[in-house]
């Protein structure tokens, strides 16, 4: 077989850099998009943010289109916006066509947060240790701060630091005393008894219960730090020390018999124990709050549901007319080429944002159209909805709908929800209809909330109650939905009343 050159004709899809940018912007969340826009503003001199009150003309029509896409509320899906065809690459025609199912969106003003921690002042009558840790201080640094303030020898301080290094984020000691002793410098000649003494000092630090080796010890440490006049303190100490397993199994009859307590008395003892923290370290090791900025706002006006983009989260970008006017024709100098390329990128970026906004509006409008029952009556009125339904309604591919509904949020009178929340599978009803799995979860949650606390509903009983309402669901499915709601099994929901 001889090597030869062969010419073939064919078609091949090519993903241009501009197309890649449009897809990437489509799947970004509002906060990520804000960062992307900020980076574009810093790197491209042709881009500028249009602030409220700016009254000078903007010569770039793409920027005007981006602002229009972020305005007026929608009552029905948007019509496809026309994009001009490009026959020549003149200075005024740097943009190319983006497919209609590739999109645009939003952003918000930069938020800079500063935090500081300080020691309690002499004027503070009462000091809350959590006030010092509100800025996100770690548990280890908080414990070391207390150790450094405590009077102790250098050897004890070294032991204390080693112990603190063995405490996990929940506040429990993960290593045995022998392992801690082995980690200490042998030249210090430390005995095991010394490690245990220092551990007891660590266990007196805040938060209460820190440095415990198991749940029982953690609860006992917290109870022993309560005032001696605390009602039912002795009974709580005895219950945790001797009968914690019975409490975990909710065997209240055995607890009342062994502790010789009446039902009302046992309830008060349990309430005292429930005030304790099973994971004391979590009071310090709190992750930084995650903020959600809704992309879409839904409101009701004259019995109609209106959809609009969140103006507070909308970027208002435009091409800087002054710099754009400096681009000269037939000038191949390095400076002019740079300015021309930046102008092209700026126009593409604005057009990609516009496309993102238009796609988001189309999808959000169709979701509201399908889920009017939820907006009017709540979760129990949620209808089954899949990506294919919305993709067919707006004339886009399911992958595009998946991108635009991920990490995008809708603000409704019933709360803020991710767009994916409105999609759910269906379950057949006795009448031959369909019921949303989200609606079934809402019904299960309602049934559990109204159950008798002494005789909680089992999964089989819940399945029977659903069947009585015409919804045929297997017990295993009920168990799956219950677990997804964070509801414990009936054996663990049983409590004294």
Swiss-Prot record:
A motif (RPON box) lies at residues 474-482. InterPro entries: RNA_pol_sigma_54, RNA_pol_sigma_54_core-bd, RNA_pol_sigma_54_DNA-bd, RpoN_core-bd_sf. One of its GO terms (cellular component) is protein-DNA complex. Residues 42-100 are annotated as: Disordered. The keyword Glycosyltransferase does not apply. Residues 71-86 have a biased composition (Polar residues). It holds the Pfam family Sigma54_AID. Residues 386-405 bind DNA. Gene3D superfamilies: Homeodomain-like, RNA polymerase sigma-54 factor, core-binding domain. GO terms for molecular function: DNA-binding transcription activator activity; nucleotidyltransferase activity; sigma factor activity; transcription cis-regulatory region binding. Disulfide bonds: none annotated. Disruption phenotype: Deletion mutants result in reduced production of pyocyanine, motility, and proteolytic activity. The motility defect is due to the inability of these mutants to synthesize flagellin. Significantly decreased porin oprE expression under aerobic conditions. Mutants also show defect in biofilm formation. Keywords: DNA-binding, DNA-directed RNA polymerase, Nucleotidyltransferase, Sigma factor, Transcription, Transcription regulation, Transferase. GO terms for biological process: DNA-templated transcription initiation; negative regulation of single-species biofilm formation; regulation of DNA-templated transcription. PANTHER family: RNA POLYMERASE SIGMA-54 FACTOR. Belongs to the sigma-54 factor family. Sigma factors are initiation factors that promote the attachment of RNA polymerase to specific initiation sites and are then released. Plays a role in the regulation of many virulence factors, motility, quorum sensing, mucoidy, a general mechanism for maintaining lytic phage in populations of bacteria, and biofilm formation. Positively controls the T6 secretion system by directly binding to the promoter regions of hcpA and hcpB genes, leading to their expression. Thereby, allows to colonize several hosts efficiently including mammals, insects, nematodes and plants. NCBIfam families: PRK05932.1-2 (NF004595), PRK12469.1 (NF009118), rpoN_sigma (TIGR02395). This is RNA polymerase sigma-54 factor.
């Amino acid at each position: 077989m001889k090597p030869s050159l062969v010419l073939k004709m064919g078609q091949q899809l090519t993903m241009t850099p501009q197309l890649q940018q449009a897809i990437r912007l489509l799947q970004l969340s509002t906060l990520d998009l804000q960062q992307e826009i900020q980076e574009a503003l810093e790197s491209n001199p042709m881009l500028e943010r249009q602030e409220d009150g700016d009254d000078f003309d903007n010569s770039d029509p793409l920027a005007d289109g981006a602002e229009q896409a972020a305005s007026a509320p929608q009552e029905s899906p948007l019509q496809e916006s026309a994009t001009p065809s490009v026959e020549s690459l003149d200075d005024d025609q740097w943009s190319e066509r983006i497919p209609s199912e590739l999109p645009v969106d939003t952003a918000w003003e930069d938020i800079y947060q500063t935090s500081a921690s300080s020691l309690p002042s002499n004027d503070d009558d009462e000091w809350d240790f959590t006030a010092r840790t509100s800025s996100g201080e770690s548990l280890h640094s908080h414990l070391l701060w207390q150790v450094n303030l405590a009077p102790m020898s250098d050897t004890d301080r070294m032991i204390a630091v080693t112990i603190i290094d063995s405490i996990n984020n929940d506040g429990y000691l993960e290593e045995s005393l022998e392992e801690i002793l082995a980690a200490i410098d042998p030249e210090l000649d430390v005995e095991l008894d010394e490690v245990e003494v220092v551990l007891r000092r660590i266990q007196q630090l805040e938060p209460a219960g820190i440095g415990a080796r198991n749940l029982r010890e953690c609860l006992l440490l917290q109870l022993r730090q309560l005032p001696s006049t605390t009602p039912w303190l002795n009974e709580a100490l005895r219950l945790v020390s001797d009968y914690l397993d019975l409490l975990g199994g909710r065997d209240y009859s055995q607890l009342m018999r062994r502790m010789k307590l009446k039902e009302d008395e046992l309830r008060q003892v349990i309430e005292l124990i429930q005030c304790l923290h099973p994971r004391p370290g979590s009071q310090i090791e709190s992750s930084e709050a995650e903020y959600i900025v809704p992309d879409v706002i839904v409101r009701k006006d004259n019995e109609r549901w209106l959809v609009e983009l969140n103006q507070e989260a909308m970027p208002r970008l435009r091409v800087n007319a002054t710099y754009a006017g400096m681009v000269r024709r037939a000038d191949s100098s390095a400076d002019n080429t740079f300015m021309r390329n930046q102008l092209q990128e700026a126009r593409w970026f604005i057009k990609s944002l516009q496309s993102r906004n238009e796609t988001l509006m189309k999808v959000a409008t169709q979701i509201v159209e399908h889920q009017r029952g939820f907006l009017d009556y709540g979760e129990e009125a949620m209808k089954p909805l899949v990506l294919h339904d919305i993709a067919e309604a707006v004339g886009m591919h399911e992958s595009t709908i998946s991108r635009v509904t991920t990490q995008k949020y809708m603000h409704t009178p019933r709360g803020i929800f991710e767009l994916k929340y409105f999609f759910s599978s269906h379950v057949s009803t006795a009448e031959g209809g369909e019921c949303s799995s989200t609606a079934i979860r809402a019904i299960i949650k309602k049934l559990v909330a109204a159950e008798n606390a002494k005789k909680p509903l089992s999964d089989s009983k819940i399945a029977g109650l659903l069947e009585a309402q015409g919804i045929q669901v297997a017990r295993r499915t009920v168990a799956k939905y219950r677990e997804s709601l964070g509801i414990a099994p009936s054996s663990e929901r049983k409590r004294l009343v």
